[in-house]
UniProtKB/Swiss-Prot annotation:
Protein name per its UniProtKB record: Type II restriction enzyme SacI
The enzyme's E.C. designation: 3.1.21.4
Catalysed reactions listed for this entry: Endonucleolytic cleavage of DNA to give specific double-stranded fragments with terminal 5'-phosphates
GO biological process annotation, one example: DNA restriction-modification system
Organism of this sequence: Streptomyces achromogenes
Amino acid sequence: MGITIKKSTAEQVLRKAYEAAASDDVFLEDWIFLATSLREVDAPRTYTAALVTALLARACDDRVDPRSIKEKYDDRAFSLRTLCHGVVVPMSVELGFDLGATGREPINNQPFFRYDQYSEIVRVQTKARPYLDRVSSALARVDEEDYSTEESFRALVAVLAVCISVANKKQRVAVGSAIVEASLIAETQSFVVSGHDVPRKLQACVAAGLDMVYSEVVSRRINDPSRDFPGDVQVILDGDPLLTVEVRGKSVSWEGLEQFVSSATYAGFRRVALMVDAASHVSLMSADDLTSALERKYECIVKVNESVSSFLRDVFVWSPRDVHSILSAFPEAMYRRMIEIEVREPELDRWAEIFPET
């Protein structure tokens, strides 16, 4: 009825692997590559925890099937969830290595909670599939090549080396990130609303901000006759409309907002946003009941941002990227979006002077 990994044994092996990962400088490159790929933006956050747990189980007992998820699967299976929740997660907090997922039970999520073994997993998000296949293939190789506990231990050490590196990077960024983050927001706010091409820069800013959150963001030139959706910037998910944003550099009335919400929902959008930044604009935020009325009337979610800085703060809150990644990627994304929407050259140069690494 499966194999039970003793908690004390697992803790001892994991601690030893962590110490080796923290002190060694030569690791198995294929496992380093796999663990690094699981830190990409599209990679599900739970996969690193699953990989660490599977390798730990095999490093404790070489009879273990590393692709098992639930102990009931067969006589070589172990409980991925029990070992992860009982040993891996608490020790990641104690020792300070990053698992990607921050919850106490990362295995209690798709696709792991509903299957007994990796071979049974058939339903997984399209973007997640390549990462699941990589993990599954790597663990299958462990079994096919009959990894010993020592070989599994070395693979675990390599994966933990990446976990430690990520944790250290986050710690370094966290020390100064509040200042740097505030600086990026303030510099972008000042740049966008001053100089030439303010409407274009506003739209580029929204598109670049959404690039930090979503993978498919559509932004077209202002007054482009080929526009086939209401709004200036759209997010498309699996070919279907998800979110549309109206970007305005002048005052917007409640009537104007309702007209946009109406046309957006008619086009199939159920998430509708307005991003307006104009000195003449009279705030719409003082009457939340009116926003709620629009939501009830048109059966959608309505979001209003009334400054560039407000919008960018939301980006930092909701993006799946870490702060360091946004700080690195946003200036380049903003530059690219400005070129796309045909912002004039002097403004591009001004942006490049603010962020010279763009």
